[in-house]
Each structure stands twice: as structure tokens, then as C-alpha cells.
A protein has these predicted regions:
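Phosphate/ribose-phosphate-bearing ligand recognition and processing surfaces
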Residues: 81-166
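Glycine-/small-residue-enriched capping loops at alpha/beta junctions
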Residues: 1-104
Length: 166
């Protein structure tokens, strides 16, 4: 099982192999974390995203990370464009992100709180689902998972989920 860390921080500045992006199925990065990642990465991220879109709910694909310290951005579809999300989608998107990270040979991965911004999903439930998915997924190459969240409530929710016995 990988080491799990929880931090309040800017996911675009983390020195990890891969950064996860909570995306829509069209891979349009218009708001929230997706927009911040698109701004920090490079123009190639948008063109690579357009080439790979659309993807299904819960699926994940990678692009280059451009000017960010990470090597890859893994875009996980947590909702339709502008639509809500669900527990099943968040869990599937987390598992898909982990599978892509493994395929890429990433040793470290930064995850954001899937579905809790534009998707409107409760942070504590997202934390429980995502930490549970990390613990149960058969990881081989990924040794470190960092949950990069915004705000005290999110940090507390993810820290509590990570502290629970597996």
C-alpha cells in the first residue's frame, strides 16, 4: 500500500510524477482545478485533451504536464459537462486514475477531491471513497499518493479518511 499524504496546496506546483484532474467527459478545462491545471501546464494540454475527448464517465486518460513539475496529467471524467456526479463515478474515476498511473509507471501521484467543486459532491464522502479506492487498488509502481485539497474542511475530511484503519 502506498504512503498517503494530505496537504492543502496547489496541485499544479507539486513535484510528483502524475497529477490527477477532475475533468468532464469532453475534457474541457473551463473551471475549478481543471482550469488551473490547463493554465499551469501548456497549450499542448488543451490540444491533447481535444484529441482524446470524449471519454466515458469514470474513465481516465493522460496528457503531458507541460510546464508543471509533474510529467503527466491524468484526466478523470467525474461528470458530464456541467452536470452532477455520484459516489459510483468518483470511485470509478479514482480507480481509473490509479490504473493509468500504474500503466505509466508513476511512482508518485497527486489526487484532488474529485467531484466536490463544480460536481457538488460532499467532501467527506468523496474522501472516504477515494482513500478507500487507493487502499484497495493493487498498486505496484505507485509508492506515494498525495491528496492536494483546498480548505480546512477538505483537509480534515481527507486526513480523517486516511487515518481510519484499512
Amino acid at each position: 500500500m502506498p504512503a498517503i499524504e494530505v496537504i492543502q496546496g496547489d496541485v499544479t506546483q507539486l513535484e510528483v510524477d502524475a497529477v490527477a484532474n477532475a475533468a468532464n467527459t469532453e475534457l474541457r478545462h473551463g473551471g475549478g482545478v481543471a482550469a488551473a491545471i490547463a493554465r499551469a501546464a501548456c497549450p499542448e494540454l488543451d490540444s491533447e485533451s481535444r484529441e482524446r475527448a470524449p471519454i466515458g464517465l469514470g474513465e481516465a486518460v493522460e496528457t503531458t504536464a507541460g510546464d508543471m513539475p509533474a510529467r503527466w496529467v491524468i484526466h478523470a471524467a467525474t461528470m458530464e459537462l456541467g452536470g452532477p456526479t455520484s459516489a459510483e463515478i468518483i470511485e470509478r474515476a479514482t480507480e481509473s486514475t490509479l490504473a493509468v498511473a500504474e500503466r505509466l509507471g508513476a511512482r508518485s501521484l497527486a489526487l484532488v477531491a474529485f467531484g466536490t467543486g463544480v460536481g457538488g459532491f460532499p467532501v467527506a464522502e468523496a474522501a472516504r471513497l477515494m482513500v478507500g479506492a487507493v487502499r484497495s487498488f493493487p498498486l505496484r509502481s505507485v509508492e506515494r499518493v498525495v491528496f492536494a485539497v483546498r480548505g480546512d474542511d477538505a483537509e480534515r475530511a481527507f486526513s480523517d479518511a486516511a487515518a481510519e484503519a484499512p
